[in-house]
């Protein structure tokens, strides 16, 4: 049975696919058999990324497949050391399903309150309403420059999340 990481968010454009792809590439470079399940069939960002990498001969090759549902992705998950679920934008019922089956759930966010507030709301809903273990939910600061003050403020805000 492979390890499963879900990358989900309440809103689009916060770096879900970028984070899913960089994580997958890092593990693949270390010799893991990795697959990204691109669950946003309307945009297919991770799948398009794979096509560009293949055309350019970039390695390591990361397996990416578009799936219409999580259950379709789960059918092949055990064939891989690591399956990364690249969730669709906006939290839905599928977001809860991804959270339930993932060993680690990553919620990417920017540094602004406009990004962090909905992310915290989602984390709280997953833990309090849907019973997702809070210890497997983590935040990833994306597109976060190098301002020590901004990073410290963001970490403080996110650390106050139950």
What are these regions (language model features)?
Residues 1:
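Short, solvent-exposed charged binding patches
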Residues 82-162:
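Conserved catalytic-core segment of NTP-binding enzymes
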């Amino acid at each position: 049975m492979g390890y499963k990481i879900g990358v989900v968010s309440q809103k689009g454009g916060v770096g879900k696919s970028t984070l899913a792809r960089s994580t997958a590439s890092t593990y693949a470079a270390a010799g893991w058999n990795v697959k990204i399940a691109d669950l946003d069939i309307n945009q297919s960002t991770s799948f398009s990324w794979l096509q560009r990498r293949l055309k350019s001969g970039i390695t390591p090759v990361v397996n990416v497949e578009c799936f219409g549902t999580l259950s379709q992705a789960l059918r092949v998950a055990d064939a891989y050391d690591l399956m990364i679920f690249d969730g669709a934008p906006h939290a839905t019922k599928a977001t809860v399903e991804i959270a339930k089956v993932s060993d680690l759930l990553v919620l990417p966010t920017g540094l602004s309150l406009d990004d962090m507030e909905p992310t915290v709301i989602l984390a709280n809903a997953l833990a309090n309403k849907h019973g997702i273990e809070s210890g497997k939910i983590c935040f990833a600061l994306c597109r976060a420059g190098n301002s020590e003050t901004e990073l410290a403020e963001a970490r403080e805000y996110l650390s106050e999340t139950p």
